[in-house]
C-alpha cells in the first residue's frame, strides 16, 4: 500500500522547504483559536463520537454488532433521542460501507433504519464485498469526495481493508489513512471489527492500532443465559464513560434498548 511516505534524498530543496513549512504550520500554542471537538451524539448524557476522531465497535461473530450500529445510525440521520440512550446532538449524514454482507443483507440495514426514522434521508449505504482490499480503500475515498456533506463514515468490516490483519506495517498504514480521512474530511469514523475468540481484545494488529488510536471502543456481547439479548459497554474511552446497557431485536426485526424508555426526538417525529 505504501501509504507512509519514505525519505527521498533526491528531493529538491524546494520540496523539503515546502514540507518544513507544512510541519511548522501544525504547531499548537495555548493562545491559538482552535475549533473544539464537535460531538455528534450522546450515550445517556455523555458526549461521544466527535468529528476528527475514530471509534471501534467490537464483538464476537453474531453478537449483533450491526444491530447496535443500526441504533447509532438511526439516531444520527433522524436526529433522535433513541430509548434515551442514543441521543443525537444534530442531524447527521452517514456514509455506511459494508464489506462483508450480500446486497440483500445490506439492504435490510437500510430498511431497518427507514422503519425507525421514517425515511432514509442522509443515509448513503454501499456494499463493497466484491472488491479487493485495495479497491475498497480507493472506493471509499471516491465516495467521500462524492458525498461531500458526510458527517460520519461507518466501515462495517475494517479488517477487509487489509490483506493480513496481523501485518503490523499494513495495519499502521490503514489506521494512518483513517486518521487522515477523519481530519481531511472533518468526519467521525466508526469501525466494526471482530473480537478475539479467546479474549476481549480486538483482532490482529489492526485491532491493537484501533485500541491505541480510537476515541472510544464499544464492545457488544451476547448474554450468557439469553441469546436474544446483547449488551453494549465501553471498554476504552476518553473522558467520562457510560453504564453498560442491553438491547434485543423486536418481533418487527428492529433493535430496541431494554428499559422503560421510548423514542423521543428534538424535531418533529416522522411518524
Model-derived features: positions:
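Acidic, gly/ser/pro-rich intrinsically disordered tails
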Residues: 267-271
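Conserved inter-motif catalytic segment of the P-loop NTP-binding fold
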Residues: 60, 89-173, 249-254, 259-266
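Short, small/acidic-rich helices and loops at N termini and domain boundaries
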Residues: 1-17
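The Walker A/P-loop phosphate-binding site
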Residues: 12-113
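Phosphate-binding/switch region of NTP-binding enzymes
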Residues: 56-62, 67, 172-263
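Conserved, well-folded catalytic cores of nucleic-acid-processing
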Residues: 75-79, 113-116, 161-164, 181, ...
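Conserved catalytic network of the ASCE P-loop NTPase/AAA+ motor domain
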Residues: 49, 86-89, 117-118, 145-147, ...
Amino acid at each position: 500500500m505504501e501509504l507512509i511516505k519514505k525519505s527521498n534524498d533526491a528531493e529538491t530543496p524546494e520540496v523539503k522547504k515546502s514540507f518544513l513549512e507544512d510541519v511548522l504550520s501544525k504547531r499548537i500554542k495555548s493562545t491559538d483559536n482552535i475549533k473544539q471537538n464537535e460531538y455528534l451524539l450522546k450515550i445517556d448524557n455523555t458526549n461521544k463520537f466527535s468529528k476528527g476522531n475514530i471509534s471501534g465497535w467490537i464483538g464476537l461473530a453474531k453478537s449483533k454488532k450491526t444491530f447496535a450500529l443500526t441504533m447509532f445510525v438511526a439516531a444520527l440521520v433522524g436526529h433522535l433521542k433513541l430509548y434515551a440512550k442514543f441521543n443525537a446532538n444534530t442531524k447527521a449524514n452517514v456514509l455506511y460501507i459494508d464489506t462483508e454482507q450480500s446486497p440483500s443483507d445490506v439492504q435490510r440495514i437500510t430498511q431497518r433504519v427507514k422503519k425507525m426514522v421514517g425515511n432514509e434521508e442522509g443515509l448513503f449505504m454501499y456494499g463493497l464485498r466484491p472488491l479487493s482490499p485495495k479497491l475498497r480503500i480507493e472506493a471509499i475515498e471516491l465516495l467521500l469526495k462524492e458525498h461531500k456533506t458526510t458527517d460520519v463514515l461507518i466501515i462495517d468490516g475494517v479488517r477487509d481493508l487489509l490483506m493480513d490483519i496481523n501485518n503490523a506495517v499494513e495495519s499502521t498504514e490503514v489506521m494512518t489513512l483513517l486518521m487522515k480521512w477523519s481530519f481531511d474530511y472533518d468526519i467521525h469514523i466508526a469501525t466494526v471489527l471482530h473480537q478475539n475468540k479467546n479474549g476481549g481484545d480486538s483482532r490482529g494488529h489492526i485491532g491493537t492500532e484501533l485500541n491505541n488510536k480510537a476515541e472510544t471502543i464499544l464492545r457488544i456481547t451476547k448474554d450468557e443465559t439469553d441469546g436474544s439479548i446483547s449488551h453494549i459497554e465501553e471498554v476504552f474511552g476518553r473522558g467520562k464513560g457510560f453504564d453498560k446497557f442491553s438491547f434485543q431485536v423486536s418481533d418487527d426485526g428492529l433493535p430496541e434498548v431494554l428499559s422503560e424508555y421510548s423514542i423521543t426526538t428534538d424535531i418533529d417525529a416522522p411518524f
